[in-house]
Amino acid sequence: AYEEIMNFNNQISHEKFLRSYSQINPNQEYFNEIISLNKSLMQMRAGRPLPIVMLENNVGQIMTSNKAFMGQKTVLYFWSQTQMNHFKRNEERAKVYKEKFPNYRFVGISIQPYNQLVRNYQEIMNIEIKDQLALVNYQTTTSDWVINLLNKGIILDKNCLILEGFGNFGYEKSFESLLRKHKKIN
């Protein structure tokens, strides 16, 4: 059921699937998880406000996501402290995207809270720390923002409205076309 919900592209199909699934599924707890996922997917659709979560900056200050991203078109991409090669590749991608799309702010988000090792690594690699944040609550944020892959990319307008909630930051051609598509929007 999880994969079906994640792969459907329109609400009518979701609702039809959920009605059928509710009739054959004997496990109410699992059904509730699927309903919750569907709700999160609907919240991440284009035109909706980005669900507000708590984030942490490099020095441990906690802030809300809307405060962190308000005022400029923003691209969110994700990384894990356990996969530093992935982080390095994403930083290289972000640098290329920044050159092509300077009207966007590119923000890397660690799915784990910051630690000193990451701070040191970012300093050695000359990474702009003002554009690096970390999740405060992994469980809540990955559920609210439907972060099921580290290559996920989210594009926001300057008012934290979602322009693209399910981009693939790691697939350059596809993601560049999304950035181009939303280039003229606030």
Where are these regions (language model features)?
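Loop/turn elements at helix/coil->beta-strand transitions in domains of secreted/extracellular proteins
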Residues: M70-K73, P102-R105, I129, K158
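Structural microenvironment flanking redox-active thiols in thiol-disulfide oxidoreductases
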Residues: N85-M125, N137-S143
